């Protein structure tokens, strides 16, 4: 058994980490930290894990005796503690944005924070960077929007098929975090669709890093808040390069089958089948569909993920499994909750 600790376990992602790790056959959670809830039993904050026996403690990094540590802290906090954690010889998976970027200047521009650590993490998207993750001591867990957007578009840029991608994502309110605000107040979200940060959401920089890095691909992104609790539905409009303007939907599908055909957590929908949020809720699966091309050369791809699982904690556990040499699906091979 491997010992696991979670730094900052009181939020939604921390709760999901606990839910899944407590059902994981190869690990034991031995420490969960929180300054705010020091001394509080975990089930007082996360009532769904009653009788886990876990209690929040305000511990220093050097006091965490673990083989692998998840840092589920606010942006800017992880970079202050991760170097000390790595010095103890443990492996770290960071769920904040602090270690997702290859260029810290990009992070500083979009997060408005000075990056004080010169340590580089591996970008934790297993279907693309599995070999790098296997050897990593530090993994930067991808953001929720980038996970669905990148996976639904990656075969297009990897095969140099498109030169422009316009991404539209609908997200549930849990993506805004555990603290209430006027944005997530029920009367403001019910019976409504709220676009926000329509051209300036920080996750566009993460998507651009992973998609623009292949070729001269221009990426645009707009998120919308919708009145559901969990899930991100992404529609990607990608525009074919002129030299590929005669590609057919069947040929398009073959690129995705070649890329994802052996990937357990990625499910490609049949022709005419639309992925739904309700099908992935509570699971680590990514459902991808669409595969349509219109007369203008626009490819329409769709994806659905659970933002708290595949978009955060489930993907972090998938990365943990890879880093520890375990079967990648351990603790994650459960299907979604429907209805």
Swiss-Prot record:
GO biological process assignments: L-arginine biosynthetic process
Catalytic activity field: N-acetyl-L-glutamate 5-semialdehyde + phosphate + NADP(+) = N-acetyl-L-glutamyl 5-phosphate + NADPH + H(+)
GO molecular function: N-acetyl-gamma-glutamyl-phosphate reductase activity; NAD binding; NADP+ binding
Domain of life: Archaea
EC number: 1.2.1.38
SUPFAM superfamilies reported for this sequence: Glyceraldehyde-3-phosphate dehydrogenase-like, C-terminal domain, NAD(P)-binding Rossmann-fold domains
Lineage, top ranks: Archaea, Methanobacteriati, Methanobacteriota, Methanomada group, Methanobacteria
One GO CC term on file: cytoplasm
Record pathway: Amino-acid biosynthesis; L-arginine biosynthesis; N(2)-acetyl-L-ornithine from L-glutamate: step 3/4
Active site: 144
Main location group: cytoplasm
Known function: Catalyzes the NADPH-dependent reduction of N-acetyl-5-glutamyl phosphate to yield N-acetyl-L-glutamate 5-semialdehyde.
Keywords, ordered alphabetically: Amino-acid biosynthesis, Arginine biosynthesis, Cytoplasm, NADP, Oxidoreductase
Cell compartments where the protein resides: Cytoplasm
SMART domains in the record: Semialdhyde_dh
Similarity annotation: Belongs to the NAGSA dehydrogenase family. Type 1 subfamily.
Protein name: N-acetyl-gamma-glutamyl-phosphate reductase
Keyword Ribonucleoprotein listed: no
